[in-house]
């Protein structure tokens, strides 16, 4: 059986220090993450033609047709997070660690 392969950019993101943040105030961090996803992250993914492949508790795996779209999406989300974190103490900031890979997917 032949596998169909395609070139894709895969963006993986997770919250830096999620366990620490959740340990301090789990209800608040979950509410903030839901708001970030609905107000910033998910719309930005759509604008840059991404498709959410999988969500984990504190992260996501997202497929893009173009590495340029993946990088632009990551920059826009990170910029939005900087704006939303302004004025918050460091221990309450939600920050994402992001990696992008370009290669064949099945």
Region spans (language model):
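Short amphipathic alpha-helical interaction patches enriched in hydrophobic/aromatic residues
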Residues: 19-22, 85, 106
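Cross-kingdom TIR/SEFIR domain
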Residues: 78, 90-93
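Active-site phosphate-binding and catalytic loops of NTP-dependent enzymes
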Residues: 82-90
């Amino acid at each position: 059986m032949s596998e169909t392969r395609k070139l894709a950019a895969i963006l993986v993101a997770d919250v830096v220090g999620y366990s620490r943040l959740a340990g301090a105030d789990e209800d608040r961090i979950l509410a903030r993450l839901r708001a970030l996803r609905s107000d910033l992250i998910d719309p930005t993914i759509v604008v840059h033609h991404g498709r959410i492949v999988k969500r984990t508790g504190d992260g996501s795996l997202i497929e893009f047709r173009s590495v340029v779209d993946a990088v632009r999406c990551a920059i826009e989300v990170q910029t939005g997070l900087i704006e939303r974190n302004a004025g918050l103490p460091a221990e309450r900031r939600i920050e994402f660690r992001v990696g992008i890979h370009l290669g064949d997917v099945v």
